[in-house]
A protein has these predicted regions:
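Alpha-helix/helix-capping structural signal
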Residues: 24, 78-79, 100, 150, ...
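Regulatory nucleotide-sensing modules
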Residues: 1-24
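Cyclic-nucleotide recognition modules
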Residues: 40-103
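Residue-level signal for tight coil/turn positions that link beta-strands
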Residues: 24, 68-69, 180
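Phosphate-/nucleic-acid-contacting segments
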Residues: 130-198
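Polybasic "coupling" helices that flank or enter modular domains
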Residues: 89-157
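Short beta-strand segments in beta-sandwich/barrel cores
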Residues: 8, 26-31, 49, 71-72
Length: 198
């Protein structure tokens, strides 16, 4: 299945039937809170499964919206359950995936409560690099940003102006190179350890 940028793969409260494996492109998941605030819960890239947080419920937990032209493979959940019953290794992989999702969610909540904006941003960029970044010839690492800066701010629990200040400070401190649709991280682990130790 192929979706143009900005299209919904599913919406919150749609009946939960399937997971979606991303083959190309990028997706964000979002949900509006009771107060009307939009909260972006995660970003997904090739190899990721979208919809796992809805397992066990009757409806999808949030909206899944494409950030670019995106191709996905639909995995009907009843078929996946049948395969997991007959293939223990697949069942184990699904369990690992769910456990990782819980850990990432817990870590995101903890970071939002305790870490400065610059540290939250660097940790987010490191996560993107580990998932789909590239190594540059000068030793830096590069992450492409298919999402908007406003989406990043919403995901990190920052105001857009706070994200802009964090980006500016990290660039002035020589920790990143902020490009239009990508960011280069310089001495990534050293800088994260230094900021976390402040």
């Amino acid at each position: 299945m192929t979706f143009k940028a900005g299209k919904r793969i599913f919406s919150a409260e749609d009946k939960f039937n399937s997971l979606y494996a991303i083959r190309s492109g990028a997706v964000k998941t979002q949900k509006y809170t009771y107060s009307g605030t939009n909260r972006i819960s995660d970003f997904f890239f090739p190899g990721d499964l979208v919809g796992v947080e809805s397992i066990g419920g009757s409806a999808y937990h949030n909206d899944a919206i494409t950030l670019s032209d995106t191709t996905v493979c639909e995995l009907p959940f009843n078929l996946l359950e049948t395969l997991c019953d007959s293939i223990p290794m697949l069942r184990r992989e699904v369990m690992i995936l769910l456990a990782r999702k819980i850990r990432d969610s817990d870590q995101m909540m903890a970071n939002g409560r305790t870490l400065h904006g610059e540290v939250r941003l660097l940790l987010f960029l490191r996560d993107l690099y580990q998932r789909y970044g590239t190594q540059c010839q000068d030793g830096s690492v590069r992450v492409r940003l298919p999402m908007s800066k406003n989406d990043i701010a919403c995901h990190l629990g920052l105001r857009p102006e706070s994200l802009s200040r964090a980006l500016h400070k990290l660039q002035c401190d020589g920790m990143i190179r902020n490009n239009a649709k990508s960011i280069d991280l310089l001495n990534m682990e050293t800088n994260i350890n230094m900021l976390c130790g402040q």
